Amino acid sequence: MTAAVTAAAVKVEKLLHVRVPLRDGIHLDANVFHPVGGTRYPAILVRTPYGKGADFPPGYSSFIQHGYAVVLQDVRGRYGSEGLFDALNQEGPDGYDTLNWIAAQPWSDGKVGMIGGSYLGIAQWRVALLNNSHLKAIFPVVSGSDDYLDRFYSPGGAMKLGHRLLWLSQNLTPAGLPKPKFGSYIGHLPLRTSDTAATGRTLAIYQTILEHPTYDSFWKDLSVRENIDRVRVPVFAVGGWYDNYVESDLDAFAALHKPGKDDTKHRIMIGPWPHNMSSPFAGVGFGNDSGAPIRAYQIAWFDHWLKGAPEDAAHYTPWAWHSVRAEVDEAPMHIFVMGVNRWRDEREWPLARTHYTAFYLTSKGHANTGKGDGALVWNLGKKAKPDQFVYDPRD
């Protein structure tokens, strides 16, 4: 389907439900939007398991206004796309084939950038590892860089059962079946059938993660962080101090930015945000400057890497005491310091001038409940009572 609409002062050509062929014969469903005109445009690609939407999302208008095409695509096995959903393995090759398809379209100039958060950020990392020549830069947000530690297991091998089963239940319960309540499956035993309790069916992805409870070669091969040397495209990562994946985001940046590498093209920004990037968090505000113009950063980033925009490009918007343009071209780190509630530019992670402080766990013998008397203290006490509790995985 083809139609034209208007995004602000720019007319938009709409190509809805375009079938994108993959190497194995599967077709993915995509919506394409680009400025009306006879020229070719660089493209912004968004690949999502959550539904690309039925029409033109107003939130992408600024890309159209700045001369980009926007491609929104349902990943394999989700919504309008064919195939079986395989989150651990599909996004690299499917993204690679999609990039080739975009480059071959009459409205494309062959240059593509990718954006998106959480799973949509993982999809960017996956294809960035494959070094498709059409992918010029990525902008992953709250995505993390290691599936084992970010999404499935804690250090030491305890499964993040609630985190994972909730996501599976919310997203992979078949249409027509009611979504079970969290309490009905979080305590389900045996673990081998918890996927059925949560979604009404056996899931290959869940069975696979049960087979790999330790950080073995399976997880290392999947890990972005472990394979970061394969990433050649410029990366602008965004994380939140209250997000599950912030440590992993910082680890990926540190690996990209380590001495001896071509680290001048990578950036990271960490703000006082949880996974959904909202503020205030838990009722605590961090001042008027705690937000960030993410879309302005994205446009500046892609104007530079997809269009070769000069440093003095006039349309970059000043923000607080710095400019978006300067952030793209200069300091590799932009972090929000809570307490003083201001942004600060840095050039390495961990910070070389860090002074590490030890904290100690203590109690009066009753730190064994959610309302216990456990505390963090500055000094290690000479004597403390033990805390005891009975663990039963069935209760």
Question: Which residues does each PLM region occupy?
Answer:
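Short beta-strand immediately N-terminal to the catalytic nucleophile in serine-hydrolase-like folds
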Residues: 114-116, 141, 238
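C-terminal, loop-rich substrate-recognition/catalytic regions characterized by aromatic stacking residues
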Residues: 186-192, 283-395
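Active-site-adjacent alpha-helix of alpha/beta-hydrolase-fold enzymes
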Residues: 247-266
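Accessory cap/linker subdomain of secreted extracellular hydrolases
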Residues: 65, 129-230, 312-313
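Short beta-strand/loop motif that positions the catalytic acidic residue
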Residues: 231, 237-239
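Cap/lid segment of the alpha/beta-hydrolase catalytic domain
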Residues: 35-104, 146, 151-154, 159, ...
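N-terminal cap/lid segment of alpha/beta-hydrolase-fold proteins
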Residues: 3-38
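Alpha/beta-hydrolase fold nucleophile elbow
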Residues: 106-119
